[in-house]
């Protein structure tokens, strides 16, 4: 949407309601530059090499991203974190409370804070392209507070969240590596700014709610006001392909109950002249054309705003008809004439940049209105606020403004759910000794991200060269494998566990964790029959008899995988012993 409220229709793209709407990719305006600077106030990692990069609000981690010789380099603290053709800086935990990063560049994104992940790629001209891969609800954090405000009723903020979510996915761009940009043509995404608690609540509480038409995502336009009547896209764009999604409706609540600062009134009292000198001068100029000489306006006798600009409009008018009494050199004379309503703005009667004229009789004369701040398509933001103040729910408000669209539940993960990690958890464990260093990479030469004590809970992600990649206290890092005891594994979906029968190819050891440094549980001879349950990095978690532990993948030959029903196994072992009697 442009600064004056007129949307630019770049592409008409449809996305199915069966899609996953959990994330959106936003191209950020960083300027034509080959380098940007970052300050990280949270736990991040580089997806390409799983190196941790951690900062805090009290002690931000400074980093630089630069393009040189066709490669991108991420550096921090005087050393290179990663260099490659692409860099993806991922958050460990998507929760808002887990921190953010701040971007410093030459474009509009300068000094803005961002949630989600950042992807860095190289444009054809050698400059950086930066894409914010962000949970959709968090993307809306950078839209809703600026389209409305924290003081608005919560139900109107929910309306804005749903409309903005629909608009974003209705405008996505196929074939590009991003869905939408942060420009004002596409809602003007402004990143993350703490403090808009009610606006953010509206974004989260409408997670997974979107407007659809025939199971596809439409372009859901919205604007400040409609001036008392909604419009059709053809009124603005000149073609009618989107008209079936919208309808012309009178909206008295928008006009009479919404912000009166979004219109100008010309109050006419019959039998008198107007208080608006520009209007009086306009009438005299038109009367002079008829009379043939200069005239003096004595009074306005009748006024009417008429002639719909478009079919079926009742309040978007093109012409003004008047009957006035003027004084001439030879006496008084009644004069009737009409003129284009657009002249009211052109000749200074009205001074604002509104879009629509209409009028109505009053007990003493007639009022002419100049209104509609925006395009009039879809939801009126001031109208939504007024309806919410009257007690309407966001569903009721959206039904009025988007009557030909359907509120639909879609797949969208809530980024504020507990432990909204960007990585799949393979197992759960705890540290088995004190003063354990969590390091930024898989060796003792990497920076320590902090020390932890015995019993500290960890979420296991992977195993690399004897080191375990894990999350401790919200930070992603590495710990040598013998310092972690693996305790539990995530429950399989619907208790359907994928397993396989296998055997060892040489003598090896069953260990307590996926690391050659871990303690040996028992020695296994060549050809030992085992059952494989899980895998972590280069290790399998297996069972042999009554024992379980980890064996290196390279020491095992596996058979076909199959599914076992854990519920059925437990039920068969329990029998009828705990079932209620009839």
Residue ranges and their predicted role:
Residues 1-467, 471-496, 506, 525, ...:
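Conserved, single-site charged/polar hotspot
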Residues 502:
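Catalytic zinc-binding patch centered on the HExxH motif and its immediate surroundings
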